[in-house]
């Protein structure tokens, strides 16, 4: 049985791709049809590929993998942070800094600085410093937290990356490829799926769609670490996953 149902995907708008003129031809195998100038993603394939991604992430988690969630556009930022934290993992949800992984040692100096500022406050140093200096330290901390707060406690370069919209996160994808880090990603009809190791064809612009898929990846991590009953996931009924392409077409036409 599938970990996600056709109904869930439809309700979240996962099937809506981009305008046909903005498509990447390499996504053709994942496209069902075109409606009113918009590509419609083949959700039967998405159901299967979400299963593949779920199992991939779950198996990696069973081996103790460090997983980095990446999604910096506004539709993804909140879900990426929430689900990464729920799964006990790490995230980048503001802006990907060039060299965040390929210049890991340099980034670690900024992480050290962030921890130093936090320690200063915890130990009461802020109370004896001039107010102007405290203001500057807080501004520095806020900026560091925004960019690297989600990886401050990441013990090493990640073993797996989950990316929302690799088209928007091309620098992150390139760094992952350079370092040989496998990438699982939500890939919309405007993106190139070739650099992605585990493709999830999906609308990556709708908040509900991003939340749904990202939550499934978090569930996979939790199940991998704690066992099958730990993840609060929905196992789709077989009938739901067997909805025909004709039925999907009717639903899409109705929208």
Swiss-Prot record:
Residues 233-255 are annotated as: Disordered. The keyword NAD does not apply. Keywords: Ribonucleoprotein, Ribosomal protein. CDD domains: RPS2. One of its GO terms (cellular component) is cytosolic small ribosomal subunit. One of its GO terms (molecular function) is structural constituent of ribosome. SUPFAM superfamilies: Ribosomal protein S2. InterPro entries: Ribosomal_uS2, Ribosomal_uS2_bac/mit/plastid, Ribosomal_uS2_CS, Ribosomal_uS2_flav_dom_sf. It comes from the Bacteria. GO terms for biological process: translation. Belongs to the universal ribosomal protein uS2 family. This is Small ribosomal subunit protein uS2.
């Amino acid at each position: 049985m599938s970990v996600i149902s056709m109904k869930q995907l439809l309700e979240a708008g996962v099937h809506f791709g981009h305008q046909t003129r903005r498509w990447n031809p390499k996504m053709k195998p994942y496209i069902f049809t075109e409606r009113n100038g918009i590509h419609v993603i083949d959700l039967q394939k998405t159901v299967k590929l979400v299963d593949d991604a779920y199992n991939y992430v779950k198996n990696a988690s069973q081996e103790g993998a460090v997983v980095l969630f990446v999604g910096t556009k506004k539709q993804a930022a909140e879900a990426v942070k929430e689900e990464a934290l729920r799964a006990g993992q790490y995230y980048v949800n503001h802006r990907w800094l060039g060299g965040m992984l390929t210049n890991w040692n340099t980034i670690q100096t900024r992480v050290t600085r962030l921890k130093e500022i936090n320690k200063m406050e915890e130990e009461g140093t802020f109370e004896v410093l001039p107010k102007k200096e405290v203001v500057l330290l807080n501004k520095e901390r806020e900026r560091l937290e925004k960019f690297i707060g989600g990886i401050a406690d990441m013990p090493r370069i990640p073993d797996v990356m989950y990316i929302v919209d690799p088209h928007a996160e091309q620098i992150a994808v390139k760094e992952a490829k350079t370092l040989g880090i496998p990438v699982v990603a939500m890939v919309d009809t405007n993106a190139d799926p070739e650099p992605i190791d585990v493709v999830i064809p999906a609308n990556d612009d709708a908040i509900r769609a991003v939340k749904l898929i990202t939550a499934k990846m978090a569930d996979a991590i939790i199940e991998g670490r704690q066992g099958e009953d730990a993840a609060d996931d929905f196992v789709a009924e077989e009938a739901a996953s067997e909805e025909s392409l004709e039925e999907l077409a009717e639903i899409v036409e109705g929208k």
